[in-house]
C-alpha cells in the first residue's frame, strides 16, 4: 500500500505521518516539476476553459497562460497586473525542485519519489530523473543541481517542504534553461551513433551526451553524415536521421544537447 502525499505537506508533517504509520504504508511525495497554483490541486480553471479536468489528471496548465484584467464598462482595455517583457503571469507558480532537501525528505520517511512527466518531453524526463538518480547514488549535489538547470523550467522553489511557497509562490520571470536539446540517440552503427534531428546541429559544435546514471560527457561533433551516408556540414531538418562518431558506450536512449 502507498499513500500519495498532498504537495502542501511540510517535512515535519511528513515525518509525523511516517512515525504514526510505522512502516505499514509507504509514502510517496512529489519532488520535482510544475506545481498547481490551487491548494491541494483543487482547480477548475482547466476544466472551465478547455474541458480537461485537473482533478482527473487532464490539467492543461491554464494558469500558465497570459492573463490581463478588464473592467466591464471598458471592453478591450486590458490592465496588466504584474507584467514583464514576456507578458503577465498572475497565476504561475514556481517549479518545485526538492534536490536541496532530498536527504531530509528520505529521512522523514518518504519511500517513493514522484517527478513530473505529463506534458513534458522525453528529454526533460530523462534529464531530471537522471539527476535525482545520480544524487541517490552519491553524486555531488552541485553537479545534480546543474543538470536540473539544463531543462526548460520556471524559477525553482522547495515548495511547502519548508513553507518557502508561502514567501515566493509566483514566477513572473517565465521559463529559463542552460542547454538546447539537439537530438535523441536512436541507435548505433559500428563506432557511430544514429540520431534524429530535433534542433540544428552544426559540425564543430561542442555537445554533451546524456547517458543514464552518469554525468554528461562533452565532445565536439565531427564527421556528420546524412541518411544516405554522405557528409553534411549540419543536421538541420527535424525528424531526419544522421550519424557521427561518439565516445564510450553511447547508444539508444541517450540524448544530445549543447550550451545555449
Identify the meaning behind each predicted range.
Residues 1:
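Conserved thiamine diphosphate
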Residues 4-5, 11-112, 119-260:
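Active-site pocket-lining/capping segments in soluble small-molecule metabolic enzymes
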